[in-house]
C-alpha cells in the first residue's frame, strides 16, 4: 500500500487516501448498505469502521483490542489462545534480531502495529487462505483503517528491503506459533500451511513472571506489555 498522510486533526472525520467515490466515502457498489458501523471502545470513544477517524481510539483501546484478538482462529494447545498483541511483540523482536542495523523508532513502531487493523476492524485475525474470499469491499475497508493508523502514528511506508525483513520475521513467528501454540506438526507446517521457515525452539520474548516459553499470555498481561512498548516508541518518534 502506498501510504499517504494528511493534516486532519482530532475530532475530524478522516477520509483517508482511499478514493472518495461516493457520499461518506462509501463506494457506489455499497449503495443501499449502511454508511456507519459504530464500535463503542473501552475509553468511551466511538469508531466508525466505514470511515475511521485516526483519533477515535486511545492507545489503551488499541492495546486492549489486540490483546483480545486471537491468532490461529482462537484455537490453542494451551488454556488460552494467542493474542495478536503477543504476536506483534514477537515479530518486532525477531525483526530487531535479524536487522543489520538498529531499527529506528518509526520502523519499530511500524513493526509493532503491522496487524493493528485487525483489532480495530472488528477484532478478527482472518487466516490467510480465507482472505481472498472476503471480497474487494473488505480489502477497501482494511485499507481505510490502515490509512487511519498510518496518519495517527505517522508510520513510514515500507521499502522493498524493510517489507522483506518484516515478512521473514512474520513467517518465522507463524511457523513457531504453529508448532508451539497451535500444535501443528513440522510436516504439516511445511506441507499444509506451506510455511518454509524452520520453527524456533527458543521463545525470543522476555517472559512475564510465571509464564512458560511460547505460552499465550492472559489478555491483561498482553495488553499491558503491548501498551508499554507502544507508548515507549511513540515517545521516541514524536507521534501524537
Predicted segments — roles?
Residues 2-240:
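Metal-dependent phosphohydrolase cores
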